[in-house]
Amino acid sequence: VVAPIPMAQLVETRIMNLLNFQTMIASKAARSVLAAQGKPVIDFGLRRAHGAEAGLLAARASYVAGFAGTATVLAGMQYGIPIYGTMAHAFVQAHTDEAAAFEHFAQAQPDNVVFLIDTYDMETAARKVVALAPRLKANDISVKGVRLDSGDLADHARKVRHILDDGGLRDAQILASGNLDEYRLNTLVQSRAPIDSFAVGTAMTTSSDAPSLDCAYKLQEYAGRPCRKRSEGKATWPGRRQVYRTYTDGGYLDHDVVTTLNDRQAGNPLLHSAMKEGRPLAPAPALDGIRKQVAIQLSKLPDSMRQLEECTAYDVRISQALRDLADSVDRHT
């Protein structure tokens, strides 16, 4: 940001608010995407989000990170994100008969018949779905799938898959939800549980195990004079800068170099002007375009950085030119 100090500081809080939160959520969501190993992951987190705007931005950030869609209808309307949803436990409980609840739901939502089958007993409910399916088929309604939301999901999925297959519903998919995060997703995928897709809520939309990101916005130059903080534990590098990214011969990320603006380094420059005098220099990219770019960049992470635990830190280097500038600034302040 290059601007008079009052203007630069007027936008500081909102820029930090948007970047901190969505970067944090997108990072958490990307870990779930990697753990799911190609199986769709859906945002179910609005009810546990820290406020309405946070829920909407979490839906956006998770979609950018690779989620298949969201259960937040307003996010779908605002951002063009695919909307997913099933039925509620309350709908089942409002009926005196579980099978009747399933049938009424199918009649009301004939194009999205995904039954929530854990209100009482999953295996019993799965058999009710099998018994109901021929009657629905006679009315051109197909069972799209079932959702499991509690208990030992791997064990329940195997038992339910067996019941559905024996009942002729081999095409019905199993969606799993219930306190999922990247670690549980990884365990379920590694166990080869017959689960086709996942819904992730609380852990993602609150980034429960890493609920903050200490991103900062600091003055680096004033009236052409480079400057920096030297506060203990909070020192910054001075001057306008550029970041260059280098890849391995195999196309994977190798390292970044942070340097002064005019110190050309090997690799691709990452910082580009987006606005001038308050006007965008180009149209904002479409959300799906951003999502594709994120997928490309995630695919370039080396295996050592794709691990859920004991992940290797990315190599970020400070150029000699930037170190020399910092020394010069320190001598004069």
Residue ranges and their predicted role:
Residues 1-167, 183-184:
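Buried, small/hydrophobic-residue-enriched core segments of structured protein domains
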Residues 162-167, 172, 180-333:
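Gly/Ser/Thr/Ala-enriched C-terminal appendages of enzymes
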